Amino acid sequence: MILALFCIFLVSAFFAIFEDKLSSFKWVIYALVGVCLVLLAGFRPVGIDNDSINYELYFFKYDNPLFENTVEPSFRFISGFLYKNFKDVHSIFIVYALFGVSLKLIAFRKLTQHTYLALSIYICTYYILHELTQIRIGISSGLLLLAIVEICNERRKNACGLFLIALLFHYSSIMLFPILFMSNKDFSFKEKYFWSGLVIAGYGFYFLHIGLATLPIPYIADKLQTYEELKQEGFIDEVNVFNIVFLVKIVIFYYIMYFYDIIKKQNNYLSLMMKMESISLFSFTALSTLPVLSFRVSELFGIVEIILYTNILYTIRPNLFGKIISLTIGFILMFIAIYYNKLIQL
């Protein structure tokens, strides 16, 4: 499994380095890499990741009333159809991988000129997290990337429609709707400081022990309090706000913000993406007392990292060196995800 993933990454990285010199034939390879990613996620052994055992349970018990409030209707409906026809959990892995991977590959072509570089970063980061683990949110994150294009081109109704579809696949997608009111206008001097300061403010919430569970909001406060109790009883892991991956993300965020004026000439969606990344980093620390919410918000908004990390090449000359640095960062993050965070069982 890991060897296959590494080989696909090497193929993508090779084409990323020489993408500028390739003909239209590169899109055939691009599609074939996508097919390989779908098959790898679709036929992975149950138990090799952290969530597939639960998905197998949801699949075979799709009509169990206990799951009505915790599993989205779309997952139960698709599971019911596939169970009756195939009775194999891999069928739903394939369906979700097909949508999750395809949506992202389409989005990469819209969001960046360096599609293979984005593909390589994706393989190293969110492919492992979403298509191999959190398959429901994998579709939502793909729809989010497509919605960025719609929002930045003032087609907010289209973006709203995409968010509504995303909500069918994962309830946490409800957090995406505030993005509809965000602007993609160039940052002013004050705005740069605000969005940069928001990341630091997250640590302020962490050190001051400010928790959302104390907010007097009916139902939500009760739900958050339940998460807090589960954490105290040891059923939910603590959030390490000083883990190496998160610190690297912060460094890259400030690096890109420093070179904002250079990068924005190449990335028409930079302002909105940086706002989303700032929210992602802020949420991870500010919501750390509620690990489930902390990870959900941070990982969903953080999908823009795939494009942002490719933007590093615009700040380095020659571009080849910039691509190598971006690929190296991606490979290191993949190594940490597999061997340190153990997102894939060896």
Q: What is each PLM-predicted segment?
A:
Residues S196-I200, P318-A337:
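Signature aromatic-anchored transmembrane alpha helix within multi-pass, membrane-resident enzymes
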Residues I53-L57, Y62, E72, R76, ...:
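Alpha-helical transmembrane segments and terminal signal-anchor/GPI-anchor hydrophobic tails
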